[in-house]
């Protein structure tokens, strides 16, 4: 799988910029995602000395709100934890964060983002006719698209900001619970599964099938997905996910077929291979 922007034709058009220049560019062109994206850039390199205490406090609040089923308090707490957790431990004095800007582009085949760069900014639309993997599972890497993002399959971790529209066949989001997928426009997909990424959509969300097993999905516009209210139910996930991509939840103790089964590590592998996670064809 090829890497952008390092080992392809974009390399000559790619330029490195400072953190201040990155914030200025995102502030100017970021639209609805600008404020949160700039905040992430700033927080990375201004780590709090009270980080551990703050995370412990938020973890306790999240536990309480989750047990009480209070979504109104749970969602802000999850978002606050994600922001704080994304800021790294104090870096060495000689550490210089890396920011790269690439122009709008269309990529042929399968690609993944450069994980040696702290933040990749696409100044325009990013289109891939194959699978696109952003940030792997890293919680301290960021991709900002100052336009729309389109791909056949999309696997995203860390911090991903898309100013306009996000469209793909199958979307998978996981960043070990501390990342964010933020879209300033609409998300339009066949399937969307999150297993550890806080998702916020300023526009509408349209999906044939959707699953959420760890964090919340906040949509300011309309939700066009028949199973949205059941997105965390094991029974619902079993209705549309290929059985070979499911595994029993050991903590539940219920091994009956079709109950308490959740996506396994094979699910993201299917997405990365360019396949469909569904048990049937739409």
What are these regions (language model features)?
Residues 101, 107, 113, 121-123, ...:
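Extracellular beta-strand solenoids
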Residues 1-109, 232-282:
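Terminal non-domain segments
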Residues 117, 134-141:
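Short aromatic-glycine motifs in intrinsically disordered, low-complexity regions
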């Amino acid at each position: 799988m090829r890497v952008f922007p390092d080992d392809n034709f974009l390399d000559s058009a790619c330029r490195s910029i400072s953190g201040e220049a990155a914030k200025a560019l995102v502030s100017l062109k970021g639209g609805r995602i600008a404020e949160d994206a700039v905040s992430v850039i700033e927080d990375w390199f201004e780590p709090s000395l009270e980080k551990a205490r703050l995370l412990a406090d938020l973890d306790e609040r999240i536990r309480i709100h989750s047990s009480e089923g209070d979504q109104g308090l749970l969602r802000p707490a999850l978002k606050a934890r994600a922001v704080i957790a994304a800021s790294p431990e104090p870096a060495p004095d000689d550490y210089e964060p890396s920011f790269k800007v690439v122009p709008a582009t269309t990529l042929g085949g399968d690609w993944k983002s450069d994980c040696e760069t702290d933040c990749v900014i696409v100044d325009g639309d990013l289109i891939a006719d194959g699978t696109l993997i952003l940030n792997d599972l890293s919680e301290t890497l960021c991709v900002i698209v100052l336009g729309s993002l389109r791909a056949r399959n999309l696997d995203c971790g860390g911090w991903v900001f898309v100013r306009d529209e996000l469209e793909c066949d199958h979307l998978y989001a996981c960043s070990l619970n501390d990342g964010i997928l933020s879209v300033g426009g609409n998300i339009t997909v066949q399937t969307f599964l999150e297993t550890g990424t806080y998702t916020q959509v300023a526009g509408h969300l349209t999906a044939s099938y959707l699953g959420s097993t760890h964090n919340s999905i906040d949509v300011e516009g309309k939700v066009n997905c028949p199973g949205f209210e059941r997105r965390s139910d094991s029974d619902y996930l079993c209705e549309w996910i290929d059985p070979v991509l499911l595994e029993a939840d050991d903590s539940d103790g219920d091994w009956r077929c079709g109950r308490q089964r959740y996506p396994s590590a094979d699910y993201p592998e299917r997405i990365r291979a360019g396949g469909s996670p569904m048990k049937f064809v739409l």
